[in-house]
């Protein structure tokens, strides 16, 4: 009781002193020319106690009065404050030491809530200016009486009362008084309390939450603790302290209770502010706190937030939507944002959204609009990412590598392996496999890409909704496709047969025309020698063999024929005689030893070049270039109809092309040639050891043969006699020819016919087969008959491929243009060398284009050529399609074709001779002569066609090789086609590599741009969060939470990822509290520009007599901390019309001070903040 009585007496004495202080007349403002009285301060007493007093200076009347705080202990420092103040007023402050002035100056700047950016220019000022500022600050504070009233309740007193552990109405009263103190006192007071007070507040909140007491006073107290935390977070210091304490976030998450809408609205707003200001780690801590609270209550972590949306309180609904937007828009990772949004949808947000959109509330409409816009932007970004994946990952190996990197060493690795293993079990049928994969693709797409934007919940019906209608339609279409493919295959075979018949007909026509020409030549020769026969003369017919040999015996015939009939080789042209002396002059002055030592040799070249050839242009590149090592073809190696006679490569000459060629294939860097020693591989022929066919060995081979067929010996003999192709196989005849004994052994074995039963099986078989006369020739003929059709079918396509390829090469315009372009580039690159001014080159040199590297070793001449064709000569690229049969022709050996056809002809001749000398059949089953005679007739017809086709093919490849001046003595047909096919393959590969290179460059460019954009967004996000914390134009550290909540309410706190990041001016206009007031919408727009311009200007000097308009300070709309509305509107009106001129600022300040009785300390604070 005594203790409470002492406290009551202390309160009475305090109240009496407070009344006495308030009754004293306030110091009025002085006129500009009037001398101010000196301050009487005791310099020695201005120690740390005085620094504490500066920390507690506040503006009277600008904050709400605090309710009386009961049961507080009296503090001895209270009685000392008045005496100390009176003592300091009596002394001269000018005698204050420099160190004390600097301490007071630092304490003054801290009490003014200046950050380090604002403190730095002030610290650089002259000591006299600092001292004058301190004196003015002390003088103003002492006159207003704030020094005498600032020590009424200290932070230590609040800490002491919080430690008492009250849980009744007294605690509620303490917390209400604490909330007002945290709101009204400066930052230094808040820092002094928050160092230990934050932990005490969290302890109280934890005790109230875990107490499970549903009394009304407990819930009111819990709400009051939340309000105290909000007041503490209204400063930058308090916000940083709470964000750094994990327990605070956990307790705030546990305090969310939809049954208390007012308290939950405050809690949700605080968490929203933390989310938009904090880094990714803070967001993770908030989510972790929500998860822990949900697990403790055994509910989903977002259940309380969604339940808050179901409440009838619109304020709570707006706050919950703010938190949802803060959580969903804060992460940088798209997948994480989609995951959080989908989780909210599953918790019931999807069903609530239509109801929320029906509520008419501006704040709620803003939050719903932010949610919808960010949802659409994320979905659009997600679809674009899928399109990029489809466009870039077109290789199955790249997709597999990405998937494997995603799942390896995770729990999903086993499932991924199981999926692959199941895919291997699909039936190995090309049609069925495709349908399986389509069905699997449909299932996977429905699982991972749900149409409504939410994760599919398969636990509801335990099944997957799969639309098989499209799959059935595909199966029907596939059946139709199979039918059409079968018909197309039949037509293709018919077309190939028609082409073959056409070529055969053409070949026969050419052969007969040649025969006609030959006969006409013989007739003309005969007439010229013997003259015309008289009419009616009969000439006896001679054998054809003698008639054919007649013309060759006539010496004069060839000269006579040269004028009438063109021979296969053209006659030597007249120009060749002077050509032996022309090889050196042909090159002009290019070779080191100039030919014949004359300067005018170049002008005489056109007179001696054959077939109207003109000398090639001599190029002189500005820098030395890499050489194209091609094989040069001279004019004397060309024929009149040669391709190189007609080329005109100058039409492709382009200065841009030549400059690009120079830059790419210059020789500024020495080319490092790696000399690789190629050792010739010695072909080691395996020498087959000669086998000695002894009787035991022959018997063993026959035993193996007979055991594999299991056919009676007599039946085998009958099959051979009858030439039964239905039962005789090629392998069977080959084995018989290989393993049968020779004729002498067969004859000797025939003597043991009487002892047949006593012989072993091989000998019995040999005895049976000894009765067949001329067994080996018979077997060889049967084998030839069995193989003939197959040989014809193998030879015909090869002849067709070579013939078609020759025609394609000659007809391809793209290939001709390509050769002209290569000739131009090669002559330019070889300028100044022995290969310069070339009329043509060997086609085998095309394969060497890929061996010519660029100066930077990053590309080749072939890739450069492909690039030029793609850019300017796209029609050249079609030559790849024009030479469709070149690949097959390159695999054909013309030499082997000719050998096979000749071998076939020899076998037919041998068969005809054997049939002529074959003995008459003695056995009724012997049908060899009959069947073989008919076979020989049909085979001869086939052979004649093959011979004709082969001759036509020979003429075609000889013509095409002569057309391109290819020396057939040095280059075979196989090499010619192989070189062209290798070049064609290399060209297609270079084309693909160029495309991949461009795609890789584009991909790298997109990745670089994306990385730069992400880095830019990260920096902008940091700046934005920094601006959210420093919302005031003058850097005030108070009102942080008010500004954040204002930004949340207006939607400006949620950054737009797809639009441009707003500038600092736009952000301040959108986040400033005065921009939300419609009454100031017009004037603030212009005033903000003025403030930013002034605020961004560096201050190199300070005028102590000038003041700045405290725009940001007076335009803070906090009803608990500001004066009357009329005065605020007056200050706002004056602020909107303020000028940057010093004179108008002074007039404005004077008018405000006179009309609204603004204390002088406010003008001083505004002046100091402006400095």
Curated annotation (Swiss-Prot):
One of its GO terms (biological process) is gene expression. Changing residue 119 to R: No loss of ubiquitination. The keyword Ligase does not apply. It is found in: Cytoplasm; Nucleus. Ubiquitinated. This is Protein diaphanous homolog 3. Belongs to the formin homology family. Diaphanous subfamily. Residues 93-455 form the GBD/FH3 domain. The modification Phosphothreonine is found at residue 47. Pfam families: Drf_DAD, Drf_FH3, Drf_GBD, FH2. InterPro entries: ARM-like, ARM-type_fold, DAD_dom, DIA_GBD_sf, Drf_DAD, FH2_Formin, FH2_Formin_sf, FH3_dom. Residues 1-40, 60-95, 532-601 are annotated as: Disordered. Residues 615-1013 form the FH2 domain. The modification Phosphoserine is found at residues 56, 154, 604, 1072, 1157. Keywords: Coiled coil, Cytoplasm, Nucleus, Phosphoprotein, Repeat, Ubl conjugation. The lineage of its organism: Eukaryota, Metazoa, Chordata, Craniata, Vertebrata. One of its GO terms (cellular component) is ESCRT I complex. Residues 1-15 have a biased composition (Basic and acidic residues). PROSITE patterns: DAD, FH2, GBD_FH3. It comes from Mus musculus (Mouse).
């Amino acid at each position: 009781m005594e203790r409470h009585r002492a406290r009551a007496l202390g309160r009475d004495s305090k109240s009496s002193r407070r009344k006495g202080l308030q009754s004293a007349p306030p110091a009025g403002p002085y006129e500009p020319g009037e001398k101010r009285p000196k301050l009487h301060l005791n310099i020695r007493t201005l120690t740390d106690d005085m620094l504490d007093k500066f920390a507690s200076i506040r503006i009277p009347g600008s904050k709400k009065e605090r309710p009386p705080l009961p049961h507080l202990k009296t503090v001895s420092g209270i009685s000392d404050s008045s005496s100390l103040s009176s003592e300091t007023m009596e002394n001269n402050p000018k005698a204050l030491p420099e160190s004390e002035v600097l301490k007071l100056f630092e304490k003054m700047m801290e009490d003014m809530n200046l950050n380090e950016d604002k403190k730095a220019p002030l610290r650089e000022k002259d000591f006299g200016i600092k001292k004058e500022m301190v004196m003015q600050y002390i003088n103003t504070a002492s006159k207003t009486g704030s020094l005498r009233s600032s020590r009424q309740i200290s932070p230590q007193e609040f800490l002491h009362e919080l430690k008492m552990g009250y849980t009744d109405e007294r605690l509620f009263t303490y917390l209400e008084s604490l909330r007002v103190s945290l709101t009204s006192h400066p930052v230094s007071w808040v820092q002094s309390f928050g160092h230990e007070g934050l932990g005490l507040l969290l302890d109280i909140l934890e005790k109230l939450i875990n107490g499970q007491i549903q009394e009304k006073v407990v819930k009111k107290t819990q709400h009051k603790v939340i309000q105290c935390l909000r007041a503490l977070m209204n400063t930058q210091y308090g916000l940083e302290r709470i964000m750094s304490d994990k327990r605070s976030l956990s307790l705030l998450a546990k305090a969310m209770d939809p049954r208390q809408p007012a308290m939950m609205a405050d809690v949700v707003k605080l968490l929203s502010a933390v989310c938009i200001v904090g880094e990714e780690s803070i967001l993770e801590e908030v989510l972790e706190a929500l998860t822990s609270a949900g697990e403790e209550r055994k509910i989903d972590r977002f259940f309380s937030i969604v339940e808050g949306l179901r409440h009838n309180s619109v304020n709570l609904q707006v706050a919950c939507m703010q938190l949802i937007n803060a959580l969903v828009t804060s992460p940088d990772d798209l997948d994480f944002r989609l995951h959080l949004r989908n989780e909210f949808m599953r918790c019931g947000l999807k069903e609530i959204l239509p109801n929320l959109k029906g509520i008419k509330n501006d704040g709620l409409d803003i939050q719903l609009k932010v949610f919808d816009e960010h949802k659409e932007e994320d979905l659009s970004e997600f679809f674009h990412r899928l399109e990029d994946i489809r466009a870039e990952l077109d290789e199955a190996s790249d997709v597999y590598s990405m998937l494997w990197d995603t799942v390896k060493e995770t729990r999903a690795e086993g499932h991924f392996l199981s999926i692959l293993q199941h895919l291997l079990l699909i039936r190995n049928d090309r049609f069925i496999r495709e349908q399986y994969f389509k069905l699997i693709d449909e299932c996977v797409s429905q699982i991972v890409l749900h149409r409504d934007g939410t994760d599919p919940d398969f636990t509801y019906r335990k099944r997957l909704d799969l639309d098989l209608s499209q799959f059935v339609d595909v199966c029907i279409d596939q059946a139709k496709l199979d039918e059409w493919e079968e018909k197309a295959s039949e037509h293709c075979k018919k077309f190939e047969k028609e082409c073959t018949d056409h070529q055969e007909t053409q070949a026969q026509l050419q052969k007969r025309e040649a025969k006609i020409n030959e006969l006409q030549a013989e007739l003309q020769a005969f007439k010229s020698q013997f003259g015309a026969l008289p009419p009616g003369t009969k000439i006896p017919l001679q054998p054809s063999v003698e008639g054919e040999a007649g013309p060759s015996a006539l010496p004069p015939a060839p000269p006579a024929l040269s004028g009438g009939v063109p021979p296969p080789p053209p006659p030597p042209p007249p120009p060749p005689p002077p050509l032996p002396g022309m090889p050196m002059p042909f090159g002009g002055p290019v070779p080191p030893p100039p030919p014949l030592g004359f300067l005018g040799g170049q002008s005489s070249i056109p007179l001696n070049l054959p077939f109207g050839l003109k000398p090639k242009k001599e190029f002189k590149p500005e820098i030395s270039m890499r050489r194209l090592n091609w094989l040069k073809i001279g004019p004397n190696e060309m024929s009149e109809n040669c391709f190189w006679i007609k080329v005109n490569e100058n039409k492709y000459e382009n200065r841009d092309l030549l400059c690009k060629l120079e830059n790419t294939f210059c020789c500024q860097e020495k080319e490092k040639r790696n000399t690789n020693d190629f050792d010739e591989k010695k072909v080691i022929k395996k020498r087959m050891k000669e086998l000695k066919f002894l009787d035991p060995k022959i018997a063993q081979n026959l035993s193996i043969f007979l055991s594999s067929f299991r056919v009676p010996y007599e039946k085998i003999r009958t099959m051979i006699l009858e030439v039964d192709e239905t039962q005789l196989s090629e392998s069977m005849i080959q084995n018989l020819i290989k393993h049968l004994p020779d004729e002498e052994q067969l004859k000797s074995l025939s003597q043991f016919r009487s002892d047949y039963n006593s012989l072993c099986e091989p000998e019995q078989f040999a005895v049976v087969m000894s009765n067949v006369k001329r067994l080996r020739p018979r077997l060889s003929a049967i084998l030839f008959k069995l193989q003939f059709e197959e040989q014809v079918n193998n030879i015909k396509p090869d002849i067709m491929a070579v013939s078609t390829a020759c025609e394609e090469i000659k007809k391809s315009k793209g290939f001709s243009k390509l050769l002209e372009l290569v000739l131009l580039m090669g002559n330019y690159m070889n300028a100044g060398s022995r290969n310069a001014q070339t009329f043509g080159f060997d086609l085998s040199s095309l394969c060497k284009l890929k061996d010519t590297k660029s100066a930077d070793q990053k590309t080749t001449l072939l890739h450069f050529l492909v690039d030029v064709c793609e850019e300017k000569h796209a029609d050249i690229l079609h030559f790849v399609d024009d030479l469709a049969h070149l690949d097959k022709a390159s695999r054909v050996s013309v030499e082997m074709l000719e050998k096979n056809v000749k071998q076939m002809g020899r076998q037919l001749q041998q068969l005809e001779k054997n049939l002529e000398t074959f003995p008459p059949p003695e056995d009724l089953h012997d049908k060899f002569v009959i069947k073989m005679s008919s076979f020989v007739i049909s085979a001869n017809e086939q052979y004649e066609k093959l011979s004709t086709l082969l001759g036509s093919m020979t003429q075609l490849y000889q013509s095409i090789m002569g057309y391109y001046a290819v020396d057939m003595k040095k280059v075979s047909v196989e090499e010619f086609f192989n070189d062209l096919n290798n070049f064609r393959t290399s060209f297609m590969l270079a084309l693909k590599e160029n495309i991949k290179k461009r795609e890789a460059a584009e991909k790298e460019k997109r990745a670089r741009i994306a990385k730069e954009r992400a880095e830019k967004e990260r920096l902008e996000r940091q700046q934005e969060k920094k601006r959210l914390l420093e919302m005031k134009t003058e850097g005030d550290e108070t009102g942080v939470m008010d500004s954040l909540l204002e930004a949340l309410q207006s939607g400006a706190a949620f950054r737009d990822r797809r639009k441009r990041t707003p500038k600092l001016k736009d952000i301040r206009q959108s986040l400033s509290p005065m921009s939300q007031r419609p009454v100031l919408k017009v004037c603030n727009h212009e005033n903000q520009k003025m403030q930013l311009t002034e605020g961004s200007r560096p201050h190199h000097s300070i005028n102590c007599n000038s003041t700045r308009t405290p725009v940001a300070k007076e335009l803070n709309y906090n009803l608990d901390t500001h004066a009357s509305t009329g005065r605020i509107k007056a200050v706002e009106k004056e602020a909107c019309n303020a000028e940057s001129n010093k004179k108008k600022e002074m007039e404005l300040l004077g008018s405000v001070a006179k009309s609204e009785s603004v204390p002088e300390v406010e003008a001083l604070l505004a002046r100091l903040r402006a400095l």
